[in-house]
């Protein structure tokens, strides 16, 4: 486990304030199970020992954040770097409102690619750049899930290499995306503002 790694996450909505504790305990139990799996030896069967060091204050703080009945994404993060065989690990938690982060067709990143004057490796690096920029924006916005690329990336690369002039390449949100994620990205190639093809 590395510092800041998400151990568990869940979308929660608590209608009755007294149900908040059960919801938080369930997410912490999932985090404990996941930590046991991640920190057990490769051939060993993961145990379900209490590896996550949880305090009553941490539980109270999370309950206070989510008990208003709105939708929240609750995330449990590793507070440090841990290796196999650790007996206890520290964590920190975050509860963020599940709200619209990116609208469908919103531009996330832009670059240019010119297969006439660039090697195929340079073209691929440009595409990876817009994907990385999209992932960065998603993480900064609090989206937990990994970015998913719509369609076939390799087909897009092949089509791009057949165009023998500079085109604009954009990463756009394929659909409305909320904090819970995932962010689905569509990669689009444009020439003079007109879409040529996309993933």
What are these regions (language model features)?
Residues 1-199:
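Membrane-proximal structural modules of membrane-associated proteins and complexes
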């Amino acid at each position: 486990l590395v510092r800041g790694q998400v151990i568990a996450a869940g979308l929660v909505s608590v209608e009755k304030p007294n149900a908040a504790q059960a919801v938080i305990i369930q997410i912490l139990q999932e985090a404990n199970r996941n930590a046991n799996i991640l920190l057990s030896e490769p051939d060993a069967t993961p145990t379900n020992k209490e590896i996550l060091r949880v305090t009553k204050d941490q539980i109270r703080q999370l309950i206070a954040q989510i008990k208003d009945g709105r939708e929240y994404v609750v995330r449990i993060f590793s507070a440090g770097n841990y290796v196999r065989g650790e007996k206890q690990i520290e964590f920190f938690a975050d509860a963020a409102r599940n709200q619209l982060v990116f609208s469908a067709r919103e531009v996330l990143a832009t670059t240019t690619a010119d297969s006439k004057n660039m090697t195929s490796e340079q073209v691929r690096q440009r595409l990876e750049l817009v994907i990385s920029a999209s992932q960065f924006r998603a993480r900064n916005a609090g989206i937990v899930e990994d970015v998913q690329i719509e369609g076939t990336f390799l087909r897009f690369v092949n089509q791009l290499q057949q165009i023998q002039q500079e085109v604009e390449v954009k990463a756009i949100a394929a659909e409305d995306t909320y904090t819970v994620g995932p962010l689905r990205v569509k990669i689009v190639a444009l020439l003079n503002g007109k879409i040529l093809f996309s993933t």
